[in-house]
Regions:
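Conserved coil-to-alpha-helix start sites within the AMP-binding
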Residues: 190-200
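Aromatic-residue-lined binding/catalytic grooves and analogous aromatic/hydrophobic interfacial grooves
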Residues: 187
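Hydrophobic, small-residue-rich alpha-helical packing segments that form membrane-like cores
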Residues: 146, 150-175, 180-181
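Conserved short alpha-helical elements in the N-terminal third of ANL/AMP-binding
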Residues: 200-207
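Glycine-rich loop-to-alpha-helix module at the N-terminal edge of alpha/beta enzyme cores
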Residues: 55, 60-61, 66-160
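Hydrophobic face of amphipathic alpha-helices that form TPR/SEL1-like repeat modules
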Residues: 1-70
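A short hydrophobic/small-residue beta-strand
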Residues: 211-212
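Single conserved hydrophobic/aromatic residue that forms the stacking wall/gate
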Residues: 220, 224-228
Length: 228
């Protein structure tokens, strides 16, 4: 038992990198763009942490170059959807009872990975899968998503603190308990923003909910890179 009231690091907005000629971030991004452009990624469904290759394959192409295939996506059917729901509900007891600061710590670590070693990878997948410029990708898939995970972790603390009743009558001690949903959250996310696509399922998870994430069919490469 921890006798403390944890407070996450004070969130700050992630600085936007410039990608100027000769800069480190530009060189890393160019390398990653070449790598991802030169391969066709086989993307499975992810169910209970396991890769599931269904064989029902749809090719993903660059929006700005329809002749360039960048991924082969294994689509989920009824069997896979039901398995994903069962897996989410199977994790409910463990995840919903985990201390909120432990859940927040997972996403704060993810934000640090994104701002460092995974930044070029995520930005490159957004550029290739959504036809965004390096600056658009940097603002969206890197900075905004980093900010979502940082600020949402602190917002969780605020929710747990601010919802406590301000007054307790004599001989009573009022308190409020914020509980996750009993079911699961089904997140159907848009094509145009990498950050929003990742934020919809993850903000629910920070608050103790389990879920099933269904990215829009046009941007599976970007979603897969974000998840992994």
């Amino acid at each position: 038992m921890v006798n403390s009231i944890p407070k996450p690091p004070t969130p700050v907005n992630e600085p936007v990198l410039g990608y100027l000629p000769g800069s480190k971030e530009r060189a890393e991004l160019e390398t990653e763009l070449k790598r991802q452009s030169s391969e066709i990624l086989e993307i499975p469904c992810i169910i209970n942490g396991e890769e599931v290759f269904t064989g029902d394959v749809v090719e993903q192409v660059m929006p700005h170059n329809h002749g360039h295939v960048i991924a082969r996506v294994h689509m989920a059917g009824e069997k896979e959807v039901n398995a994903a729901i069962d897996a989410a509900m199977g994790a409910h007891a463990m995840w919903s009872t985990m201390p909120w600061q432990a859940r927040a710590a997972i996403f704060l670590k993810a934000s640090e990975m994104l701002r460092g070693p995974r930044r070029a990878e995520i930005n490159a997948s957004t550029m290739l899968n959504q036809s965004k410029t390096c600056h658009q990708a940097e603002i969206d898939s890197a900075c905004e998503l980093i900010d979502f995970w940082r600020f949402n972790s602190d917002y969780a603390r605020q929710i747990y603190e601010d919802l406590q009743p301000p007054i307790s009558p004599s001989s009573m001690w009022n308190s409020s308990e914020v509980r996750p949903l009993e079911g699961f959250v089904f997140s159907v996310t848009p094509f145009n923003f990498s950050s929003i696509a990742a934020n919809l399922p993850s903000c629910a998870a920070i608050m103790g909910n389990v879920g099933v994430w269904k990215p829009v069919s046009y941007t599976h490469l970007r979603a897969h890179e974000t998840y992994t």
